[in-house]
């Protein structure tokens, strides 16, 4: 991975120090909680946004996701979803950030896939009308069982400002019907961003890159072959051990 394409999530306790030491960007996760967009005070465990802004010159913003989905059947829930997405996009634009990550929002056993794709496409056609040409919204997989749910939205909307954030850790849990490498191959034509962490193949652990069953080195090689310009965020609670591992394995240029 080229360092200019690599980011560290602000969930990492040492992300600011590691970003400075390795010359990496930061993905701001402070706005994952929607109340922060309304001016609510940060949680005690959060890294201050200002501290993150002083540690790097490159940023991605991760928007809110709790109880939000563009496939909502209740019109009031749908209104809240669109409001929160608009707030997050405005926040990113105000901060001069051109890439924003939002969860795609599929709920298994709640939405039919066809409904989810149709409703998501309609919402994103509406929201993209107010998004600058130089901004990219990346939809992230969480509980989606297969990548075609995301690529179908991309095909329906057909707008370069809407792309995929492939969370490889989420693709390696019990929610996924396919292994991560299959997700990567299917998503590649629409891939703009990747979330990287490891686990044991069942639950979402956000474990170190070397602590799990995923072949991180192999996935990074495949990513380089399929989507060499995609950016990548390490979503870890501790960054330095995984960064040292990447350097040791000659995976970070």
For each feature predicted by the language model, list its residue ranges.
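Alpha-helix-loop-beta-strand connector modules within alpha/beta enzyme cores
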Residues: 48-66, 121-133, 216-223
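Histidine-acidic metal/acid-base catalytic patches
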Residues: 1-2, 17-19, 98, 147, ...
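Charged helix-capping and loop-helix junction motifs
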Residues: 41-46, 77-86, 114-124, 176-186, ...
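N-terminal pre-domain/capping segments
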Residues: 1-87
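Active-site acidic/histidine proton-transfer and metal-coordination neighborhood
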Residues: 71-163
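Active-site beta-loop-alpha junctions enriched in small/polar residues
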Residues: 9-13, 29-33, 64-66, 105-107, ...
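Hydrophobic faces of well-ordered beta-strands that scaffold small-molecule active sites
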Residues: 3-9, 24-28, 59-63, 100-102, ...
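A short acidic, helix-capping loop that chelates divalent metal ions and anchors anionic groups
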Residues: 35-36, 67-73, 107-112, 173-175, ...
